[in-house]
Structures are given as structure tokens and as C-alpha cells.
């Protein structure tokens, strides 16, 4: 038995039985006992069997070597435990020293039998599983023991898009699966086991667990029947193991920091604020529509300042033919990008370089470029553009050059420095590559690296419809949710009931699901793209649903891109959109991340010139109005009197223990700014959802109070203060201003030309 120890973990491995155990030093009874590891590969003589041959050990690592009967196939398994890390690191490598090609199916990192994973001295009876979906649109969230993981029923239409072919689609109660990383949790013990691959450059990782009656666990890396040639080797990505406190407000922080370091994540960009054409016009765009919205955003720039203006799908001849345009775009894209730049915005354009529309010209001119199945048929990339689509085989050199030219053309010839790159999963379908010496993960990663290489280091790249692990270190922004839509629940061709529970179809509900459950990825990996903000009045979203979408986008700190006809927005809806600016920092705490599949309680701890406050969002995901309860103890305030202002209703209250919000609308939200009670307290405003970021200066001297407000934009609205004394006078920028004092609430009407100063005398 070989052992490694640090302050967090005691690790032991038995090379002969190919099993290891993990004991937590932090959580005394948490342990993983006798987890087995292996390799599945096929030779000309059948499945290869491996035997232990040698080992090496240092202070921080154990390296075990195994050989097959021919002694020509060498498997190395390396475990690392470093003094300053709370993880166990595990990695595998296969070398082919023989003269025959072998078929590699998967690296089996761990198989843990039921009863071998413990979180406390007692049997785990309140368990849950956090599941990360394969790509941007794949549903993510926590499932409780006894529940069933929701799956799409649209097999040929949706499955190729959202599910990794190597990850089982568990369907029974208490059976769950995840891609790249996951967490198994014991609510009673308040301990969880986080497992995850640090990258997905080599293989796509799969994690499967059955929670009842006791949790088991399987983890493997999919090698996709890769053909390992003589003299070649195949290595895995690194897997890490960590026991964690489930009450930690950032339970995945250490894991994502390790992922960030492994992938050399790009320096975080300023969170973009912009406009996108897709969710109002879809493919029905024209140069005049683009120019009309460009003029409109210029007119509202002082009230709603944007920095990105992005043209989406609809300009190209077809998806697959990127060097020709729709007849309505006779001059191509360069004139539009120049107009956008001249107007002061960063010009963005949509591309889908790996997928091919079924009726694309490319299908006829280069049928040999299309991905094939193992039966020789064209691989199905899912239901796109009202038909089943195709995909490109990136292992063909001519296809690689085609992708290079497509990116080069958009960035250099059309002069778009901001690219929204969509449907990228298509390079990694369940397929038979022309060159079978690569895994699907390797093919996709190389394709993404080609995109970054051709776009250049200064280009802003947004990945969409991309497997999560593949994009780390490549993209500045990454879509983390299903498409939003002007409808709350999915529908197609007007039909609602049969599509209502589809977890990945475009809808506001499905977008918000992942916006909240994947908010944990930021700021560690990229700027989260929660998809677009829709505030227009002529959609099928109710006002409470619009408020919920805006709240979810704002409180998670992701990108803000509006997708409405800007020339038609009412003043009220423009003010609603502007209330998200400036963008909040990306440091949300999803309180019920591990207890609800669709989280409903999320907060941010914020600070301004007067001090700290907590911003809390309470959502009602029911289809009818309900009462929502705010309990101070749940948010860390015990027997402390607090002041509260709710943004959407302007309700203000003193709270000592709890507060009930009556009849919160279906799919609605209450957004609460919570502050300690003081004789004079800034309660917030209707200028910004956070109700406090605008306060840049607060100076109280004798009986005089000076307040400085700054939003970086023009705005008109109302500021609220708690004051136990009525002021004698209130001035804004040296002039008397309208104010009202009643029941200790001081209401001030303010106008900001980006900033303003208010003087109060008591």
C-alpha cells in the first residue's frame, strides 16, 4: 500500500488491485474507499488485460505502471497530492510500443461501489447530485435523491446538440450523469465530494452516480474508439477530487481556480454591454434594419450606453457558405462594420464555422467534407434551420483551411473584432472521422485553437453551443444557457404543451435555469453570457417575467446584450434596461444551488460609500402567484434590525426577523436591498437594480449630509433615505429640489447628468 498525505487529504493506493482510498482530514468521517481504476481498449486479440509492473514515489506523487500480456502496451497512472492543494490529482497515459494499432475506448478513472463513499459516520440519506451539462445549451443544476433527471424527448432533433454521446442518459429515479465535473452532496452531513477534470483537451469526461440506497460513482474519459498507432501515446486530462463544505458560498471556487490555471485562462475583459439583432429579427435582417437600430442606440447612448453592436444570423447566403451574401446584402458586411466603428461601437458578427445547413451550397460542392457516421451516412447535427443539419469533418486538411479562411475573412476583410461563434458542438458529434487517430475532444479543441489563432489575440470571441470544457482558455465570453426567447416556456409552430418541459429549447425559463445554476463559473473562466435581455412590450413575456430575466442577468454579473428593436422601445422599458448599468461584479451566491434544481434564492454582497449591503433576489417559479418569505437568519442576520427596499414594487420596510411578500406574480421576483438600521440610511433608488452602486460619496458632518451619485450615464429617478429627522432643506447641485418626508422615509427626485451632488441640512 502506497500513501500520500497533506493537511486536507490522506490517500492510499493498492497497485495490485488497482484501487485507491481517500480520507478527508477536514471532514473527519468523509472518505472514499477502494475506488478502482482501469483502461478499456481493444487489440486484434480482443480486450487487453493489464498487470502491475512497477512504481515510483516522491513526496508529492505516486506513479504506477501496468503492461498488457505482450508487454507492448504500457499504462501509467499518476496520483499527486501537493502540500498547498486540497485536491487529489489523477492522470492516466497509454503508450503503444507494439507494431499493431489498438482501439482505445476509455480511461476508467474510478468505479466506486455503493457503500464505499461516506460523508459522515451515519448512512447518507439526504443526498443530491450537481450535474453540469455537456455544452452551452445543456441543462445544468442539482437533483435530489429520488428525483429523475429531465431529458429531452426530441431524440434526433435535440440529442446530437446537447448530449455527449459518451455520457449515459440516466432515466431512473436517483440515477444522474454529468459532464466534465459534478458534486455528490450529503445535506445532513453538510459535506460534498467535488470531482472534475481540469480540462477537456484530450477527452470528454463523464460522471455517473446512483444515489439510492447509497451513492456509487463512476468516472471515465471517452476515447471514442481512437486508433492508437504504433509508437504513439494517448494521455488523459487531469481529474481532481475534493471534499467540500456544502454551505460554502463558493463551493466550486478552488476547483475553478485550478481549471483556470490549467487552461491559462485569458485575462478577464470588461463585461460587455451591447445590442444583438437575433431575438427581434431572427434571420429577417437587412442593412436598413441594422442601420435603423444603430441610429437608435446612438440616440439613447447617454441614457443606455452600449459598447458592442452585433449582427447575428441572416446576412450569409446559407450556413456553410460564408463568402457569399443574401441578395439584400449586395455590399457584404464591411460597409456595415465600418459604420458601426464610426458610430463608436465595437462591431460584432455571428458565424457558425463547424455546422452546415442541409441545403447549403457546400453540401453539393464538397460532400466529402461532411462528417460521417460509422455506417458511412452523413452525421446528424440536430434540428437547425427547420431541418436536420450536417457538420464539417475538421480532421480533413481542406476543411481546416476552410475554417481558417472563414475566420480570417470576418476579422481581417470584413473588419469585425468581435465574433459570436455558434453551434460549435458540431465538430464533436458521434461520428467516424476521416482521420481516426483523434478523440472528439481533441478535434474540437484543435478547431477552437485554429479560430483563436486566425482571429488573433486581440479579438473578442464569444463561444455559443460549445462543450463547456473545450472553450476554456479560448473564449473571452461563453454562453452558459439555452437560448432565451420572447416566450416563458418552449413552443414550436405555436404548439406549447408537447414542448413545455423540453429542457434545452429556447425560452426565458430555460435560459434562467442555467444563468443561475452556472453563475458559479464566473469570474474564474470567462465572462458568462446569459444570452440576451428582452424588455420590449410586444413579446409574450409578462412584465414579471421580464423583471425576472433582467434580475437574473443583473445579479449574476454576466454580459448585458439587449435584443429588441431599439427604435420602438418605450421610455419605461428603456429605463428598465438601463437599470442594469453599470454591470454588477460577478460574485453571486446561489443560496439554494444544491437544494433546488431551478434556484430561487440568490444574493450579492455589495459596498458603497455608506457601507455594506446585501442584494437578494427571491424568485417565484410557480405558475400562480404565491407569498415569498424573507428570513433574516437565512442570510446571516441574527436578531438584527434591518431596513429593506424592494426594487420592482418600491416597498420599504423595517425587518427584525422576517418579512412576507404577498402575492408575488407567477414567474415573478422580488429584488431586495437589505441594510442595517441606522438613524440616517441610504435605502436605494429606482436608478439601478442593485439600489446602491450609484452612491459614490456620503459625508455626514454635524447636521449636514452631502451625497454624491454617479452612474456613468444620464438618468432621472427617485432616491430613498431612511431619516429619523425631517430635513430643513435639500439641494441638488446648488438648487432646491423636490423632496418628501413621511414615516421616516425621505424621497428625493434626482436628475443625473452622469453624476450629481445632493446637500441636506437637518
Go through each PLM region and give its residues.
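Extended acidic/polar, glycine-enriched regions
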Residues: 101, 187-266
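Non-catalytic C-terminal accessory domains or segments of carbohydrate-active enzymes
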Residues: 653-762
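Glycan-recognition and catalytic regions of carbohydrate-active enzymes
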Residues: 157, 528-538, 561-624, 652, ...
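Polysaccharide-binding surfaces and accessory modules of carbohydrate-active proteins
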Residues: 2-9, 13, 18-205
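Carbohydrate-binding surface patches
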Residues: 175-183, 187-191, 549, 553-556, ...
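Glycan-recognition surfaces
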Residues: 363-397, 401, 446-569, 593-597
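Solvent-exposed beta-hairpin/edge-strand motifs
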Residues: 112-124, 633-649, 721-734
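Aromatic-lined carbohydrate-binding/catalytic grooves of carbohydrate-active enzymes
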Residues: 271-408, 412-434
Amino acid at each position: 500500500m502506497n500513501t500520500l498525505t497533506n493537511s486536507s487529504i490522506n490517500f492510499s493506493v493498492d497497485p495490485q488491485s488497482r484501487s485507491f482510498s481517500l480520507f478527508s482530514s477536514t471532514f473527519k468521517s468523509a472518505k472514499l474507499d477502494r475506488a478502482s481504476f482501469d483502461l478499456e481498449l481493444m487489440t486484434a486479440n480482443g480486450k487487453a488485460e493489464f498487470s502491475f509492473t512497477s512504481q515510483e514515489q516522491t513526496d508529492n506523487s505516486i506513479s504506477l505502471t501496468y503492461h498488457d500480456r505482450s508487454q507492448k502496451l504500457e499504462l501509467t497512472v499518476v496520483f499527486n497530492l501537493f502540500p498547498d492543494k486540497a485536491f487529489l490529482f489523477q492522470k492516466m497515459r497509454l503508450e503503444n510500443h507494439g507494431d499493431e494499432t489498438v482501439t482505445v475506448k476509455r480511461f476508467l478513472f474510478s468505479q466506486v461501489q455503493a457503500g464505499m463513499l461516506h460523508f459522515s459516520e451515519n448512512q447518507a440519506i439526504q443526498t443530491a447530485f450537481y450535474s453540469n451539462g455537456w455544452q452551452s445549451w445543456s441543462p445544468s443544476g442539482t437533483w435530489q435523491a429520488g428525483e429523475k433527471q429531465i431529458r429531452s424527448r426530441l431524440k434526433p432533433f435535440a440529442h446530437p446538440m446537447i448530449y455527449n454521446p459518451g455520457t449515459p442518459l440516466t432515466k431512473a429515479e436517483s440515477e444522474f450523469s454529468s459532464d466534465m465535473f459534478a458534486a455528490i452532496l450529503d445535506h445532513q452531513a453538510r459535506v460534498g465530494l467535488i470531482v472534475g477534470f481540469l480540462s477537456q483537451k484530450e477527452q470528454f469526461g463523464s460522471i455517473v452516480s446512483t444515489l439510492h440506497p447509497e451513492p456509487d460513482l463512476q468516472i471515465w474519459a471517452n476515447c471514442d474508439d481512437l486508433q492508437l498507432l504504433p509508437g504513439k501515446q494517448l494521455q488523459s486530462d487531469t481529474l481532481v477530487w475534493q471534499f467540500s463544505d456544502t454551505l460554502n458560498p463558493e463551493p466550486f471556487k478552488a476547483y475553478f481556480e485550478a481549471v483556470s490555471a490549467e487552461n491559462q485562462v485569458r485575462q478577464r475583459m470588461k463585461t460587455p454591454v451591447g445590442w444583438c439583432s437575433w431575438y427581434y429579427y431572427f434571420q429577417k435582417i437587412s442593412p436598413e434594419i441594422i442601420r435603423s437600430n444603430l441610429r437608435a442606440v446612438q440616440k439613447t447612448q447617454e441614457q443606455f450606453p452600449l459598447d458592442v453592436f452585433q449582427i447575428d444570423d441572416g446576412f450569409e447566403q446559407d450556413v456553410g457558405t460564408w463568402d457569399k451574401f443574401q441578395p439584400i446584402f449586395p455590399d457584404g458586411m464591411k460597409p456595415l462594420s465600418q459604420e458601426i466603428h464610426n458610430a463608436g461601437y465595437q462591431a460584432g458578427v455571428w458565424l457558425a464555422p463547424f455546422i452546415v445547413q442541409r441545403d447549403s451550397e457546400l453540401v453539393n460542392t464538397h460532400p466529402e467534407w461532411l462528417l460521417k457516421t460509422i455506417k458511412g451516412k452523413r452525421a446528424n447535427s440536430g434540428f437547425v434551420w427547420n431541418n436536420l443539419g450536417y457538420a464539417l469533418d475538421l480532421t480533413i486538411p481542406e476543411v481546416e483551411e476552410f475554417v481558417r479562411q472563414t475566420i480570417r475573412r470576418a476579422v481581417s476583410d470584413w473588419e469585425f473584432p468581435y465574433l459570436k461563434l455558434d453551434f460549435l458542438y458540431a465538430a464533436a458529434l458521434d461520428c467516424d472521422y476521416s482521420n481516426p487517430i483523434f478523440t472528439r475532444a481533441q478535434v474540437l479543441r484543435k478547431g477552437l485553437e485554429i479560430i483563436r489563432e486566425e482571429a488573433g489575440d486581440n479579438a473578442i470571441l464569444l463561444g455559443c453551443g460549445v462543450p463547456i470544457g473545450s472553450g476554456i482558455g479560448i473564449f473571452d465570453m461563453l454562453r452558459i444557457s439555452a437560448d432565451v426567447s420572447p416566450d416563458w416556456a418552449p413552443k414550436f409552430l405555436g404548439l406549447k404543451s408537447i414542448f413545455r418541459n423540453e429542457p434545452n429549447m429556447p425560452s426565458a425559463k430555460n435560459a434562467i435555469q442555467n444563468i443561475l445554476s452556472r453563475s458559479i463559473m464566473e469570474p474564474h473562466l470567462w465572462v458568462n453570457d446569459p444570452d440576451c435581455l428582452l424588455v420590449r412590450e410586444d413579446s409574450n413575456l409578462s412584465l414579471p417575467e421580464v423583471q425576472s430575466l433582467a434580475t437574473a442577468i443583473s445579479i449574476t454579473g454576466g454580459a448585458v446584450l439587449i435584443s429588441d428593436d431599439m427604435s420602438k422601445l418605450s421610455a419605461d422599458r428603456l429605463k428598465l434596461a438601463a437599470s442594469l448599468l453599470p454591470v454588477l461584479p460577478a460574485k453571486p451566491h446561489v443560496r439554494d444551488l444544491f437544494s433546488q434544481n431551478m434556484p430561487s434564492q440568490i444574493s450579492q454582497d455589495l459596498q458603497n460609500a455608506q457601507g455594506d449591503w446585501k442584494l437578494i433576489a427571491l424568485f417565484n417559479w410557480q405558475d400562480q402567484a404565491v407569498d415569498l418569505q424573507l428570513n433574516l437568519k437565512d442570510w446571516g442576520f441574527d436578531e438584527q434590525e434591518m431596513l429593506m427596499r424592494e426594487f420592482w414594487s418600491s416597498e420599504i420596510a423595517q425587518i427584525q426577523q422576517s418579512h412576507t411578500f404577498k402575492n408575488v406574480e407567477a414567474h415573478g421576483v422580488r429584488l431586495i436591498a437589505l441594510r442595517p438600521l441606522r438613524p440616517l440610511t441610504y435605502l436605494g433608488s429606482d436608478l439601478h437594480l442593485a439600489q446602491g452602486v450609484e452612491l459614490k460619496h456620503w459625508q455626514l458632518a454635524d447636521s449636514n449630509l452631502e451625497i454624491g451619485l454617479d452612474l456613468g450615464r444620464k438618468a432621472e429617478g427617485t432616491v430613498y433615505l431612511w431619516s429619523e429627522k425631517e430635513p430643513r432643506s435639500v439641494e441638488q447641485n446648488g438648487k432646491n429640489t423636490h423632496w418628501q418626508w413621511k414615516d421616516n422615509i425621505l424621497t428625493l427626485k434626482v436628475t443625473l447628468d452622469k453624476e450629481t451632488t445632493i446637500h441636506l441640512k437637518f
